[in-house]
Amino acid sequence: MPAVKVVERTPLFLKAVVEGAYPSLVNSLRRVIISELPVMAIDTVIVVNNTSVMYDEMLAHRLGLIPLTTPLQSLPPIEDCESGLADPSECTVRFTLQVNADGEVTVYSGDLVSERPDVVPVHKDIPIVKLVKGQSIVLEAYAKLGRARGHAKWQAALASYYYYPRVEVRDESCRERCREVCRDLTNPLECTFNKAMTCRDLCGDKLHVDWERNKYVFWVESFGNYDVDTALREAFRILKRKYSLFLDALARKSSSAAEAKL
């Protein structure tokens, strides 16, 4: 039975020691987190007026990279949005941006006006473009649910892991030699497996480095679209659904093969 011990936690970051799981399972979770989690991002921009020095295409690109809060609990499942089962209007949010400069002014992400108060820029102070007196920007932007496998602007979080190192210091002089790489050689949470291996290259046979089988240090960092608890909950839901679809496909394949033999 896999076991998890949380060693560091904030609303947007989590580090834990995972034990008793196969690498394939841990890596599957990592890949779902970095490429499958749904988030809102601006995907379509209708420029009504743009007299700034920035091209419309670059302006739209910048808008798309602004992270938006994404209340998954009040949105349809991403699968329904992708398949068309959900009303498209429930999977999109309209923004407007209208700025007329009376002097030098910087347009920030906070100037975007959303039709939904729960879908807004995560950070209000992301600069979009600078305007001088007489310039203006008027546009409509539409954000939709998407996944990072389609474009990086839909990436909700990063995740990674390393094998839990097991370090044996055979000569105390090695600690000082490796201090710039690892302050505490025997602390797996500070000295990653790769760092320990770097120290082994420095110390030779004075340091032995191994790893514990099926034990890892796993961490997740959210970009702020939602907290890390929501990210993990959604990642497990997606992973569980993938396994169910895979088993169903296997069952159908097996059934078809059996019928063919008859």
UniProtKB/Swiss-Prot annotation:
GO terms for molecular function: DNA binding; DNA-directed RNA polymerase activity; protein dimerization activity. SUPFAM superfamilies: Insert subdomain of RNA polymerase alpha subunit, RBP11-like subunits of RNA polymerase. SMART domains: RPOLD. Its EC number is 2.7.7.6. One of its GO terms (biological process) is DNA-templated transcription. It catalyses: RNA(n) + a ribonucleoside 5'-triphosphate = RNA(n+1) + diphosphate. It is found in: Cytoplasm. It is an enzyme of class 2 (transferase). Part of the RNA polymerase complex. Belongs to the archaeal Rpo3/eukaryotic RPB3 RNA polymerase subunit family. This is DNA-directed RNA polymerase subunit Rpo3. The lineage of its organism: Archaea, Thermoproteota, Thermoprotei, Thermoproteales, Thermoproteaceae. The gene is rpo3.
